[in-house]
Amino acid sequence: MGPRRQKRKPETPRRRPASPAPAAPRPTPSLGTSSRPLARRRHTVLKEIRTLQKTTHLLLRKSPFCRLAREICVQFTRGVDFNWQAQALLALQEAAEAFLVHLFEDAYLLSLHAGRVTLFPKDVQLARRIRGIQEGLG
């Protein structure tokens, strides 16, 4: 005799859901903006650039810049810590920001000349090299 086989139970039909739940409606973009996140991000970046170009306030925060200026001063004076006037630090920060803005403008023009939109370190290096020793700080 062979192995015994069990009787099969009749299967009860399983309940299936009628249909999948409808997806939640996506919010429609207002004022005709593109629904793609990349295009939206690009527009917000361009808007931020335009607003920052119109402003005249300082973009670097004062306390980190003051700490950096004092740290560099201590390095060049062999440990002697000088007292800085607030106006002197403000003038130094204005000059540093003007230098950086001008450098990045030139570097971005070089990247556009190369047919790119992305700014690479080699663009900044070339801008400093073209400026020379006086304007490029060596």
UniProtKB/Swiss-Prot annotation:
The modification N,N,N-trimethylglycine is found at residue 2. The modification Phosphoserine is found at residue 19. The keyword Iron-sulfur does not apply. Residues 39-138 are annotated as: H3-like. SUPFAM superfamilies: Histone-fold (SSF47113). Residues 19-28 have a biased composition (Pro residues). Trimethylated by NTMT1 at the N-terminal glycine after cleavage of Met-1. Methylation is low before incorporation into nucleosomes and increases with cell cycle progression, with the highest levels in mitotic nucleosomes. The keyword Transmembrane does not apply. It comes from the Eukaryota. GO terms for molecular function: DNA binding; protein heterodimerization activity; structural constituent of chromatin. Residues 37-52 are annotated as: Important for flexibility of DNA ends that protrude from nucleosomes. Keywords: ADP-ribosylation, Centromere, Chromosome, DNA-binding, Methylation, Nucleosome core, Nucleus, Phosphoprotein. Residues 1-40 are annotated as: Disordered. Transmembrane segments: none annotated. GO terms for cellular component: chromosome, centromeric region; nucleosome; nucleus. It is found in: Nucleus; Chromosome, Centromere. Residues 73-114 are annotated as: CATD. SMART domains: H3 (SM00428). Gene3D superfamilies: Histone, subunit A (1.10.20.10). The CATD (CENPA targeting domain) region is responsible for the more compact structure of nucleosomes containing CENPA. It is necessary and sufficient to mediate the localization into centromeres. Component of centromeric nucleosomes, where DNA is wrapped around a histone octamer core. The octamer contains two molecules each of H2A, H2B, CENPA and H4 assembled in one CENPA-H4 heterotetramer and two H2A-H2B heterodimers. CENPA modulates the DNA-binding characteristics of nucleosomes so that protruding DNA ends have higher flexibility than in nucleosomes containing conventional histone H3. Inhibits binding of histone H1 to nucleosomes, since histone H1 binds preferentially to rigid DNA linkers that protrude from nucleosomes. Histone H3-like nucleosomal protein that is specifically found in centromeric nucleosomes. Replaces conventional H3 in the nucleosome core of centromeric chromatin that serves as an assembly site for the inner kinetochore. The presence of CENPA subtly modifies the nucleosome structure and the way DNA is wrapped around the nucleosome and gives rise to protruding DNA ends that are less well-ordered and rigid compared to nucleosomes containing histone H3. May serve as an epigenetic mark that propagates centromere identity through replication and cell division. Belongs to the histone H3 family. This is Histone H3-like centromeric protein A. The lineage of its organism: Eukaryota, Metazoa, Chordata, Craniata, Vertebrata.
